[in-house]
């Protein structure tokens, strides 16, 4: 690769393209002489829409095809929603950059007949659409009277299903709705005492081939230090729990002065068990904070909960 060319691998979904176009534009602004092209493609997760994500298996469900392009020398970088990027990357690839995080909250989206309701006032039997086991487990814990139904497809397809009456409400990532221009559909941001967000939610992760210093230098434009530290703690927490993108593990992080605060959660799929705690430490110890919190939750039964989930997924 020469310094005058950069090829970006991306999923071709509408949200992925919005995110990748933003990355391209920011890099182009910082490096006006760089010729940047986008190679868009469908991933396994984009193609299989009639099966719940958790039943497909989650190792690189939305990333493998993009990674193959880089390993074959057809692209220099790949843009991911960081929450979709596994914590263990293929040999030869690294996480080169994490962008500034947008709101990582989960959001409640309702149809016309439920405009009068908040999540806590939805009537018994209301149908809640979500494809996330993390959201499912936490909401079952707090609202066992609601009915949860899997929902797949892109954001527009999901909104159409909601508005047609197939669901009473949806739980979606606030950042995705905002990036797609649907901020007006956010009816309620779900408080973190109800739903901790996914690891990396709201941030973009840019993956690249290891050893490519010229590429890393180009990506420095987009690196956001505090987001990176927060996500480092979150990803080490997830890695230590041996969890993936489709497990009921949630987090919340913040940085106050030089102190990093990580809150983590593991829940059973039936919503009957939920283990949650907080760990604090120096920002420079972000990775260790994640590991320590994971081990604390394991000591309180999180490992057994996850093993039950992994067993049921393999069955």
UniProtKB/Swiss-Prot annotation:
Keywords associated with the record: Chlorophyll biosynthesis, Porphyrin biosynthesis, Transferase
InterPro entries: HemC, Porphobilin_deaminase_cofac_BS, Porphobilin_deaminase_N, Porphobilinogen_deaminase_C, Porphobilinogen_deaminase_C_sf
Entry's Gene Ontology molecular function annotations: hydroxymethylbilane synthase activity
Assembly description: Monomer.
HAMAP family: Porphobil_deam
Extra remark beyond the main annotation: The porphobilinogen subunits are added to the dipyrromethane group.
Name used for this protein in its record: Porphobilinogen deaminase
Annotated source species: Prochlorococcus marinus (strain NATL1A)
């Amino acid at each position: 690769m020469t310094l005058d060319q950069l090829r970006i691998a991306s999923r071709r979904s509408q949200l992925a393209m919005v995110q990748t176009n933003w990355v391209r534009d920011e890099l182009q602004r910082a490096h006006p002489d760089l010729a940047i092209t986008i190679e868009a493609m469908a991933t396994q997760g984009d193609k299989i829409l009639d099966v719940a994500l958790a039943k497909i298996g989650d190792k690189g469900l939305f990333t493998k095809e993009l990674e193959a392009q880089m390993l074959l020398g057809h692209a220099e970088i790949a843009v991911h929603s960081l929450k979709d990027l596994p914590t263990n990357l293929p040999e030869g690839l690294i996480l080169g950059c994490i962008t500034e995080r947008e709101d990582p909250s989960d959001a409640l989206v309702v149809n016309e007949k439920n405009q009068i309701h908040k999540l806590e006032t939805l009537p018994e039997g209301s149908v809640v659409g979500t494809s996330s086991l993390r959201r499912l487990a936490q909401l079952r814990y707090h609202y066992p009277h609601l009915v949860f139904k899997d929902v797949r497809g892109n954001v527009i397809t999901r909104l159409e299903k909601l508005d047609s009456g197939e669901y009473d409400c949806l739980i979606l990532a606030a950042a995705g709705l905002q990036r797609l221009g649907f901020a007006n559909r956010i009816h309620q941001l779900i408080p973190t005492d109800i739903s901790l967000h996914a690891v990396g939610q709201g941030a973009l992760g840019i993956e690249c081939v290891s050893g490519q210093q010229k590429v890393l230098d180009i990506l420095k434009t987009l690196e956001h230090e505090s987001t990176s530290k927060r996500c480092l703690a979150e990803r080490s927490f997830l890695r230590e729990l041996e969890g993936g993108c489709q497990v009921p593990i949630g987090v919340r992080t913040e940085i106050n002065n030089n102190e990093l605060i990580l809150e983590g959660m593991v829940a059973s799929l039936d919503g009957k068990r939920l283990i949650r705690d907080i760990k604090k430490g120096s920002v420079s110890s972000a990775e260790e904070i994640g590991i320590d919190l994971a081990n604390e939750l394991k000591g309180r039964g999180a490992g057994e909960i996850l093993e039950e989930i992994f067993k049921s997924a393999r069955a």
